Amino acid sequence: VMVGGRGDKTLNRSLNRASNDIARQPGSSIKPLAVYGPALDTGTYSLASAIDDAPYYYSGTDAKLVTNFTKGEYRGLMTLREALTVSQNVPAVKILSKLTPQVGYNYLEKFGISTLVSPKNAINGAHDVVQSLALGGMTRGVSNIDMCSAYAAIANKGTYTKPIYYTKVLDSEGNIIIDNSVPETHKVLNENSDWLLIQGLRSVA
């Protein structure tokens, strides 16, 4: 599948917005993958766990205030389900801080996010094992296909299936050259945790 943009077509097989050709900051859409899914899957939190939505600072020497979408707005104690429903930033950062950013990073790897930057491969000192990962602040962003396949894993009872562009390649005589008919899969979330995450996401609607 090729997904283009606006303007006149000037090249063939150039920029494909559906694939890894382009990546953008995911923002709050990363929260279920890096924060709430891991929080439920590790058993550290439940949908009813209380988190205090109050002024909170990132750790480190350059500690900055974590802001919600509406700056200066704090809702006090709220459940994880409520924090997910209204997409509050402070609870998400607090939860990831307790889990540790490394845990969130590891889950994103399992969800098939291919653009992650590890501390070992930092770009000008920037990497993704940081608290701001909870809010989608990523060094290289995320591609559409990675996000789609990650969310598909949630819909598939926590099982990730590596996306493919074709199932088979045949030669002129019908012989199979490449066979992708059996996809690569692995478990990311256990089914109970995945069910809870889906219930939380349904509250958003």
Positions of predicted regions on the chain:
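Generic beta-strand/beta-sheet core signal
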Residues: M2-G5, L33, A48-A54, R81, ...
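Secondary-structure capping and boundary motifs in well-ordered enzyme cores
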Residues: I22-S28, G72-G76, L80, L84, ...
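A generic secondary-structure signal for well-formed alpha-helical elements
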Residues: T42-S46, L99, V103, L108-T115, ...
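Mid-domain, small-residue-enriched loop/turn segments at the edges of structured enzyme/sensor domains
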Residues: K64-N68, T100-M147
